[in-house]
Amino acid sequence: MPRRRVIGQRKILPDPKFGSELLAKFVNILMVDGKKSTAETIVYSALETLAQRSGKSELEAFEVALENVRPTVEVKSRRVGGSTYQVPVEVRPVRRNALAMRWIVEAARKRGDKSMALRLANELTDAADNKGTAVKKREDVHRMAEANKAFAHYRW
């Protein structure tokens, strides 16, 4: 780690079709082996399907799906006197988005549909309807934080 100065976070360029930084980040998370154009094709196709199903614009529908998956609290391990506690902590906004996107992509990859675009569209549709694997993951994380509320005073 550099000691001289704090290095700022890299600015991510907005995606070419919608001009959204959030969507550009989502494409980057979905991308495998540096194949960005393939990832973009998959995302845009999935968003088109999502927009048709929901009746909203692509970006609006994506935002709703993402909002339903964003976690507000998570647990972090904290070692105190020989025992490890799962301490609930609030999630920072940037990490909130990153986790939500990662969970959606993971859930889509585990689905059994034909193409990745269809799997992603189905997962986003489920997320928008507050169901599906990604939403379940968020609820599990929240449940874990709720169960360990007693250790909240170990925060750092």
UniProtKB/Swiss-Prot annotation:
Transmembrane segments: none annotated. The keyword RNA-binding applies. CDD domains: uS7_Bacteria. Keywords: Ribonucleoprotein, Ribosomal protein, RNA-binding, rRNA-binding, tRNA-binding. InterPro entries: Ribosomal_uS7, Ribosomal_uS7_bac/org-type, Ribosomal_uS7_CS, Ribosomal_uS7_dom, Ribosomal_uS7_dom_sf. Pfam families: Ribosomal_S7 (PF00177). GO terms for molecular function: rRNA binding; structural constituent of ribosome; tRNA binding. The keyword tRNA-binding applies. GO terms for biological process: translation. GO terms for cellular component: small ribosomal subunit. Part of the 30S ribosomal subunit. Contacts proteins S9 and S11. Belongs to the universal ribosomal protein uS7 family. One of the primary rRNA binding proteins, it binds directly to 16S rRNA where it nucleates assembly of the head domain of the 30S subunit. Is located at the subunit interface close to the decoding center, probably blocks exit of the E-site tRNA. NCBIfam families: rpsG_bact. PANTHER family: RIBOSOMAL PROTEIN S7. This is Small ribosomal subunit protein uS7.
